[in-house]
Amino acid sequence: MRPWKRLAASLLLTVAALPVHAEDKTATGAGLNEAAVPATLQKAVDDVIRPGYRAMHDSASKLTAAMKALCADPSTARLASAKSAFGDTVKSWSRIEIVDTGPIIEKNRFEHILFYPDRKGVGLKQVQALIAKADEQDTTVEGVAGKSVALMSMTALEYVLDGNGSEVLATEKQNFRCRYGAAVAGNIESTTKEIADEWDAPEGVQKSWKFPSKDSSDFTDNKEAVTALLGVLVHGAVKIRDQRLESFYKGDPASARPKMAVYWRSGNTWTSFTGNIEGLKTLWEKADMASLLPSDKRDVAAKIDRLLNELATTAPTINPDIEAAVGKDTDRAKIDRLLSVSRDLAKGFSDEYGGAIGLSAGFSFADGD
C-alpha cells in the first residue's frame, strides 16, 4: 500500500466519527479546479513540506548543541538555554508534524521524534529506568538509536530536562542524565536530516508528489495527490482535537487529566497546539489550497480562514500550566472553545472543502474510489 493510502485509510476512520452534513451537497458546484492542481502540488512540496523539515532539522541541531554545552559547562543559564532550544524544536516539529505521510512514516521515524500518547505510562517508566541504570552506552547517538522509540523521542528529552531529578543538569558536569539527553537530541537531529534529505532529492519523493504519473510510487494522477493533501488537512485537524485537547480534557473538569497533555512538564502544550495549527494554516495558504475550489464555493475558504485564525490566536492566551488552566473558569472556557472550533475545522475540511472539490467525508480514502 502506498504511504498516502495508509494515511487515507486512517483518515476514513477518523472522519467517520464526525457528523456528516455536507455529503448530499458533494455534487454541487463545478468540483475540483484541475488547472490549479499542478501549482498547488509544487507549492505544497517546495514552499511548505521541504522548508518545514529543513527548519525542524535546524532546530534539532541547535538543540543538540545546547544540550552538549549544558553537559560541558552546567549552569542555571545553560539549562534555561537548553529548555528554550527544546521549546523551539517543539514549535518547529509541531508545524511539520501534520504531514504524517511520506518518508516520516517509514522506519518508525515519526515515533522516533515524538512518542505520544503514552496512555499507560510505559514510555515514562522506560526513561526513568534507563536514567536510574546509567549505562554508558546510552550516552551515544548510536546507543540511543538502538533503543525503543519511547527512549529516543521528544517526550524522553522533555523528561530529562523537566522531570524528577532534572536539577542535577545545572550543577553536575558531564552527568549521565545530561549526556543521555544530548544523545536523544542528536538522534532526533539525525532522523530529521534523513527526512529532509529524502524530500530534497530531486529524483525522489518530491518528484513523485509534484508530478503524479502511473510510474510514480506515490500518486498515479492529480486526484490521488489532492486526496493526500486533503487527508493531511482533515487528519491533522482531527488529530489536533483528539490528541492535543481530548487527551486530557473533554469538557468536564472533574474528569480532566492534565498530566496526559503533550509536553505538560515543559509548559509546551499550547506551543505544540499552536504549531500544529500554524502547520495547517501554512499548507492551506502557501499551497493555495483554496484555488482548487470552484468559483461558487469560495465562501468555504473564508470560513476555514476564520476557524484557523481563531484557533491560532486563542491557544497562546491560555495558561501553559495545564492543571491550573483546567481549574480556572476563564482558561477552561477558552479550551472549550478550542474543542468546538477544532471540530468545526475538521468538518470544514472534510465535508465542506472536500465536498466542494468532489471529495467528501463519505469518499473512500482507503481505495481511491
What residue ranges belong to the model's regions?
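Bacterial N-terminal signal peptides that target proteins for export
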Residues: 1-9
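Mature extracytoplasmic or organellar-lumen-exposed domains after removal of signal/transit peptides
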Residues: 24-369
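Sec/Tat signal peptide C-region and signal peptidase I cleavage site
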Residues: 18-22
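Bacterial N-terminal signal peptides
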Residues: 8-16
